[in-house]
Swiss-Prot record:
One Gene Ontology term of the molecular function aspect: ATP binding
Residues the entry annotates as binding Mg(2+) 2: 317, 319
Organism: Streptacidiphilus jiangxiensis
Cofactor: Mg(2+)
Motif (Substrate specificity determinant motif): 405-420
Residues annotated as signal peptide: none
GO biological processes: carbohydrate metabolic process
Function: Catalyzes the ATP-dependent phosphorylation of D-glucosamine (GlcN) to D-glucosamine 6-phosphate. May be involved in the phosphorylation of acquired extracellular GlcN derived from the hydrolysis of chitosan, i.e., in the incorporation of exogenous GlcN into the bacterial GlcNAc metabolism. To a lesser extent, is also active on glucose, but is unable to phosphorylate maltose, 18 other sugars and several aminoglycoside antibiotics.
Protein name, per record: Glucosamine kinase
Family: Belongs to the actinobacterial glucosamine kinase family.
InterPro entries assigned to the protein according to its UniProt record, in alphabetical order: GlcN_kinase, Kinase-like_dom_sf
Note accompanying the cofactor annotation: Binds 2 Mg(2+) ions per subunit.
Domain of life, per lineage: Bacteria
Length: 438
């Protein structure tokens, strides 16, 4: 008698839940495993929601092996192909625990290869046409999952096209917010993210290979993209920030500032320590901002989330800020959060160019930083007004949120990349009015 999927999963090595890209030697998964739910894709392929002995839950693309067992599907095995084929059929899933939502354009394609990058999720390119992204670790029952499914669906329904065209979503029907198991979007061959294309553009500007107008055009295009994204996301609704919301922002920002002051070493730390009381005073301005509109936002918005291919721009990764708890990633936020994320990253592109380019003239780069941020904001405001959505954006949040973003850059440097400390140090040096530096 052939063992069923549940029996095969229970007998498998607990490392079954880990993708090959994850450092298996450093991640101990306790067994035995238990199969909570299974979507059978046919021909020995399935998607399982698997629970380890510590109650952690995992999305596992499964394939039966030649020895009568089961293993995690690898790129080339065909499980991602079978998921895309299921989307193309647009049929209901045989198990009510799963929701398979197909958008326009899903079609059966063949051929798989993995994307070799360090990421939380596992991605497979199918037929050089689509990218299947498997969510690896799932939230505990009752906890909110990734907001990506709802945000991608809202953008697709709202006619937002500045993202890789969504083919479909696989979710687990659980509670008020479905849990995302896999997303399928169009593959953009040759696409570069902003830490490549934007740095290259500004470097070419500094070398005289681009005019200032040419180098500023992407910033304006990103401003338009961001406004269209926010207008589409806001169609899901908006809520006013309460006094408690605003107070919580201030508490979190002051805690981060205190941590940065205590942990940033050297001359950069001394400068931050001197600036900290003035930055905290700016944070106090938040107290007057109860009532500002909150909407679904991207949540981790910077140039690295913007792909450029064939002169077009596409925003990716709607999972929210990975360092935040799931409930905060899913919560509505001010539109200014995304605006600040992008304007700060435009600034940081310029800092990187000056730091990494020998003999570069910093003057045109610094001029580009200021002009690019203005171009972005002007296009953003103009597009919101054209969409009758200018009430989404409260520009009183720009300064406190921007200071908070640079403080988080200090913390990122301390925790992960020590040399990065030059970026927020230079940014705040230019950002802070002279009166705040005294």
């Amino acid at each position: 008698m052939t063992p069923n999927w549940s029996e095969l999963v229970a007998a498998a090595d607990p490392a079954l839940v880990l993708p090959s890209g994850e450092r298996r030697a450093e991640v101990a998964v306790p067994g035995p495993l238990r199969l909570d739910a299974l979507l059978d894709l046919g021909e020995g392929h399935a998607v399982g929601v698997v629970r380890s002995a510590d109650a952690a839950r995992w999305t596992v693309p499964l394939v039966r092996d030649g020895a009568g067992g089961v293993r995690r599907s690898r790129p080339g095995d065909g499980t991602a192909e079978h998921l895309v084929a299921a989307l193309a059929r647009r049929g209901a899933t045989p198990d009510a625990a799963f929701v398979l939502e197909a958008f326009t354009g899903a079609a059966p394609v063949t051929g798989e290869r993995g994307i070799i990058v360090d990421q939380t999720n596992e991605s497979v390119i199918v037929g050089e046409c689509a990218v299947v992204k498997w969510a690896v670790r799932l939230p505990a029952e009752g906890e909110p999952g990734s907001p990506a499914a709802q945000r991608i669906a809202a953008l697709a329904r709202g006619g937002f096209t500045e993202m890789p065209r969504p083919w479909g979503l696989l979710t687990l029907a659980e509670g008020a917010q479905p849990v995302l198991l896999a997303s399928v979007v169009a593959y953009l061959p040759g696409a570069l993210d902003g830490w490549d294309w934007a740095v290259d553009d500004v470097r070419r500007l500094a070398r005289g290979e681009l005019t200032m107008d040419q180098a500023l055009l992407p910033a304006a295009q990103l401003g338009t993209l961001t406004a269209r994204m926010h207008a589409a996301l806001a169609a899901r609704g908006r809520t006013p920030a309460t006094a408690a919301d605003v107070a919580a922002w201030g508490v979190r920002m002051r805690e981060e500032l205190d941590e940065a002051v205590a942990s940033v070493p050297g001359a950069e730390g001394e400068r931050l320590k001197a600036w900290a009381p003035r930055i905290a005073d700016v944070y106090a301005e938040l107290d007057a901002l109860a009532g500002t509109p909150l909407i679904d936002v991207h949540g981790d918005f910077h140039v690295g989330q913007i792909l450029r291919a064939d002169g077009r721009y596409a925003v990716v990764d709607f999972d929210g800020n990975p360092v935040l708890p799931a409930d905060q990633r899913a919560a509505r936020q001010p539109a200014a959060l995304d605006v600040v994320g992008m304007t700060a990253s435009l600034d940081h592109v310029g800092r990187v160019v000056v730091f990494r380019t020998p003999d570069v003239d910093p003057a045109p780069v610094r001029a580009w930083i200021a002009a690019a941020q203005r171009s972005f904001l002007d296009a953003y405001r103009t597009t919101l007004a054209r969409l009758d959505a200018d009430d989404l954006f409260d520009d009183r949040l720009l300064t406190p949120l921007r200071y908070a973003q640079e403080v988080r850059e200090y913390l990122y440097a301390v925790r992960h990349l020590p040399h990065w400390v030059y970026v927020p140090d230079l940014s705040l040096t230019d950002l802070l009015p002279e009166r705040l530096k005294d």
